[in-house]
Each structure stands twice: as C-alpha cells, then as structure tokens.
Amino acid sequence: MDLIILVGIAIALLVVIISLYLLQKKNSTTEAKPAAAAPQRGVPQRAQEGVPRRAQIARNQRNRLRQNAPVAAAAPQAEAPAGSDNDDDAQADGEGARLPQGAVLDEKMGAKKRAKMEAKEAKRVQREQELYDREQRKAKEAKEDAERKQQEEIEAEAERKKAEAERLAKEERERKEHEEYLKMKAAFSVEEEGFEEGDADEQDNLLADFIQYIKDNKVVVLEDLAVAFKLKTQQAIDRIQELQADGTITGVIDDRGKFIYVSEEELVAVAKFIKQRGRVSIADLAESSNNLINLTPVSAEGSS
C-alpha cells in the first residue's frame, strides 16, 4: 500500500514540473513578441532590415566614380586617336556608371557588378595592347617599305650610271672611228695628189709593181700588201677594187682579209668546166677548183 502511494506522489510531482515548464516557456514567448517590430505592409524586406536599396547603391557608386574622375582625367592620354574605338567599352553600364581609367573598384560592390566592370577593364587593356601591336606593325612595314624604296633607287642609279658609261664609250668609239676614217681619207687624197703631181712613169711603174705583186703571190694578205707598198689596208683594198672594176685583175676578197687572184685563163677553164657538166654543185666546183685554179705563188713554182 505504501508503494502505490509513493508512485502516485512521484507522478503528481512530475505533472506539476511539466506544467510549470510549459507555463514558463509560454510566458517567455509572449514577452519577446512586443520587442520585435511588426512587419510593415508595402515596405521591402531589405528596407525593414536596414539594407540600402539598389538605387541608393548605384547613387553612392556614381558619387564615388565622379570623385575619382578628375584623378583619371589628369593621366596622359597616350592613345588619343583610339578614343573613338573605345567608346563602346567606356560607356556606362545598365545604371549609367562609367569606369574611369585607373579607378579602384569598391569593395562593397556586388560580385556580378564587379565581374562586369573587371571584364570591361580587361577588354580595354586588351584593346590598347592590340592597338599598340598594330601601330608597331605599321611602323615596321613603313620602315621596310622605305628600305626597299631606297634599295630600288640605288639599283636604278647604278643602272643609269652603267647605261651612261656605255653610251659615252660608244660615242668615244664612234668618234675615234670617224677620226680614223677622216685621216685615211685625207691620206688617200694626198697620195692621189702626189701621183698626179709625180712623174707619170713612176706612177705607172708603181702600179705595175702593185699588180705584179698580186699576180705573183696569187693569195695576198691585204695587210702585207699594204705594208709592201706603204699604204693603209683600206687604201690597198680600194686600189684592188678599182683594178677589178676596170678589168685589170680578177679575183675575190674573202672574209679572212685575203685577196685571191684568178687569171683570165683560169676563169675560162672554170667556165668551160661548168659548161661541160651542165649542173655543178658547190662541192664539185670546190673540188675541181684545186685543179682548175693554181694558187701556188710564182716564187714557189720557180724554186720547185
């Protein structure tokens, strides 16, 4: 019986303790509600919590940027012509903010805003680097063009000097040839006058010796003939042509500077040979000419 009483007392005490605990908790909750401000209808949660609105943040940001603008404007603008190219990158963002060169980003700025402005700054730096590289490339190309033009001018000047030297050399050569021609012509005229004024017998003897020298040697080197009779080579050629024209001698001057004398009898023999054969090739004529035309000098025939 005593055990049942003790269990009942314990249960009663436990119920009382639980009731007191619940009552105390309810009272503490009721006291805390008046301390908290009731939410206001129509007012944003950020304003109720004391957080500045986005418009206020933008105004504060613009104020700070305007304060930093004079400092950025004082820096030298090295790339002034490229200002028009950077207008798009320097425009204000969605709320009209402009990032001046060298401006320090606000620590309180939002992460998205900061990333956007950092991207614009990186793009501006990249644009300036590209502009610098382009200017360097243009300067290098201009230098190479100038060097190429200078080299072309040097080559053109060298070519002009070479052509001028060739022209002067040609004129000098033609002048000397003309002087030689005039001297030869004058000497020929003087010699002709001497023949006319000299003794007629002496002239005839000299001409006869000239003709006999050709007939005796058969093949005469024109330079040797001129030396033998104290004439110039051209004078000797002119005299031979005159003698051929009047029929005194017959023969041919080859391209090696020799006169080959052919007598009348030998010409008749060649003509007879051609007439007999009817048609004669050059090879046959050349082969037969060795027998028809005697090219051995008279002095050699006498000694043999």
Swiss-Prot record:
Region entry Disordered, spans: 31-174
Principal location listed in the UniProt entry: endoplasmic reticulum
Localization of this protein: Endoplasmic reticulum membrane
Low complexity biased stretches: 53-82
Origin superkingdom: Eukaryota
Keyword Transmembrane helix among UniProt keywords: yes
Membrane spanning stretches: 3-23
Biased composition (Basic and acidic residues): 105-174
Pfam families: DDRGK
Record carries keyword Zinc-finger: no
GO cellular component, one term: endoplasmic reticulum membrane
InterPro entries to which the protein is assigned, alphabetical: DDRGK_dom-contain (IPR019153), DDRGK_domain-containing (IPR050899), WH-like_DNA-bd_sf (IPR036388), WH_DNA-bd_sf (IPR036390)
Record topology, Cytoplasmic segments: 24-304
Record's keyword terms, sorted: Endoplasmic reticulum, Membrane, Transmembrane, Transmembrane helix, Ubl conjugation pathway
Residues in the Lumenal compartment per record: 1-2
Cystine connections: none
Membrane topology of the entry: Single-pass membrane protein
One MF annotation (Gene Ontology) recorded for this entry: ubiquitin-like protein ligase binding
Subunit and interaction comment: Interacts with Atg9; the interaction is transient.
Function: Substrate adapter for ufmylation, the covalent attachment of the ubiquitin-like modifier UFM1 to substrate proteins. Required for ufmylation of Atg9; protects the nervous system during aging, possibly by stabilizing Atg9 and supporting its function.
Family: Belongs to the DDRGK1 family.
Record's protein name: DDRGK domain-containing protein 1
Organism encoding this protein: Drosophila ananassae (Fruit fly)
